[in-house]
């Protein structure tokens, strides 16, 4: 599937979502550090992981995508998604790994753009969008519910390697 360069413009180009470009490295790492040092995540991660993530996205594989949000020409946030196939869902599942909007750009409809883009221009076999959200992130939970998300009563377990 061919990836599109620019995804969506709205309101006379006031808000925009587009795929990462090579030149986004510095601003992505800066915003990823903001995100991973915020209450929206359980713990911070080494800065090298942001750089590795960016490299993996720019490499252009079929499993990881990066989206940059802009508002009035300013970097406003980012999204990172991962793609997998799920027998349970019966098709492709997009995991929203990271979704971060800088505080001064929140409640301007930017987060909604990512989900609209995934549904409109994503893989035609897409059956589910999945994400994690901290219980205390009330504004994000409210947005996700308005967009049709529901609580998935699975617990998750991980093993670090």
Language-model segments: what does each one mean?
Residues 66-68, 74-83:
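Conserved beta-strand in the GNAT
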Residues 101, 107-120, 142, 146:
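Conserved acetyl-CoA-binding loop-helix of GNAT-fold acetyltransferases
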